[in-house]
Amino acid sequence: MSWLSKLMPSGIRTENTPAKKRSVPEGLWEKCSNCGSALYGPELEENLEVCPKCDHHMAIRARARLNSLFDPDTATTEIAAQLGPVDALKFKDQKRYGERIKASQKASGEYDALIAMRGTLKGNPLVAAAFDFAFMGGSMGSVVGERFARAAEVALEVGCPFVCFSASGGARMQEGLFSLMQMAKTSAALGRLREAGLPYISVLTHPTTGGVSASFAMLGDINIAEPHALIGFAGPRVIEQTVRETLPEGFQRSEFLLDHGTIDQICDRRQMRDRIAELTAMMMRQPHPQDADAA
C-alpha cells in the first residue's frame, strides 16, 4: 500500500484496491452445448432444458421429465422405489461396482437409472417411466429391468397406457448376464400389455443405444424421438471402424431414422405432453384430452 493510500480515508477506494467479488449462485447460468449461448437457469428449466436460441434439446433429469408429463400433483405413486442395485458378481474394473453405485447415488440423488410413476395425463390414468442419464449413463441393470416390468404390470392392473422415455448407454456391464436378462424380461412384460390391448409408447431421447435400443425402446406401438437424438445399437465410430466405410451424414440421428422408417415421428420436448395425451386418448378410444379438460 502506498503512503498516499494510507493518508486517504478508509471509505475512499483507489483504482488499485480490489473490489469485493460478488458470488453468483451455482447453476444460475448455463451454456448451450450446441450454440454456446449463455442461458438463465430458471428460464431454461421452465423451457424443459431446451435452448430458446437454437432449440437444442439438452439433458433433462428423469423426475423433471415425468413432472412435465403428468397432471400436477397426480404422480404421487412411485413404482418399486425401494429397489436398489446389488453387486452380486463382486465386479471390479478400475473401481469396484459397489463404489460406483454409491458414487452415482450420491451424485444423482437416485437409487438407480430408471424412475417409474403412476398418475394422470389430462385426466386419464397413465403409467410412465424415464431414464436418468446422470446415473451411470442410464445403463440398464437388474433394478432398471425390474422397475420397468413392474411399471408394465401396474399399467396392466389399472388398464391404462404405458410410456417410457429412454436415455441410455445400454446394458450395465458390471452386472454381466443379470443385465442382459433384462432385455428379455422387459420385452416379455410388453408382450403381456399387448395381449391385453393396452398401448405402449416409446420415446427415444439422446442417447438411446445398446441393449436398451435392442429391446423395449424399439417395441413401442408408436415410437417417438426427440429432435437430433442419437439412436442405435453401436455408436457411429464403432460402426465405421468395423465396416471401414464413412457413414452418411446424420446417420443414427432421429431425422435420419424417420426418413428411413425406423421411427414413427419426431416431437419437440415442449409439445411432448400434448402429443402423448392425444395419442393415448386416440388409442384408448377416450374423448379428446382437451374435451376432457373442458369437462
Curated annotation (Swiss-Prot):
Acetyl-CoA carboxylase is a heterohexamer composed of biotin carboxyl carrier protein (AccB), biotin carboxylase (AccC) and two subunits each of ACCase subunit alpha (AccA) and ACCase subunit beta (AccD). GO terms for cellular component: acetate CoA-transferase complex. Signal peptide: none annotated. Keywords: ATP-binding, Cytoplasm, Fatty acid biosynthesis, Fatty acid metabolism, Lipid biosynthesis, Lipid metabolism, Metal-binding, Nucleotide-binding, Transferase, Zinc, Zinc-finger. It holds the Pfam family Carboxyl_trans. This is Acetyl-coenzyme A carboxylase carboxyl transferase subunit beta. Its cofactor is Zn(2+). PROSITE patterns: COA_CT_NTER. Residues 28-295 form the CoA carboxyltransferase N-terminal domain. Residues 1-20 are annotated as: Disordered. Its main location: cytoplasm. Belongs to the AccD/PCCB family. It is an enzyme of class 2 (transferase). A zinc finger (C4-type) spans 32-54. HAMAP family: AcetylCoA_CT_beta. It comes from Xanthomonas axonopodis pv. citri (strain 306). It catalyses: N(6)-carboxybiotinyl-L-lysyl-[protein] + acetyl-CoA = N(6)-biotinyl-L-lysyl-[protein] + malonyl-CoA.
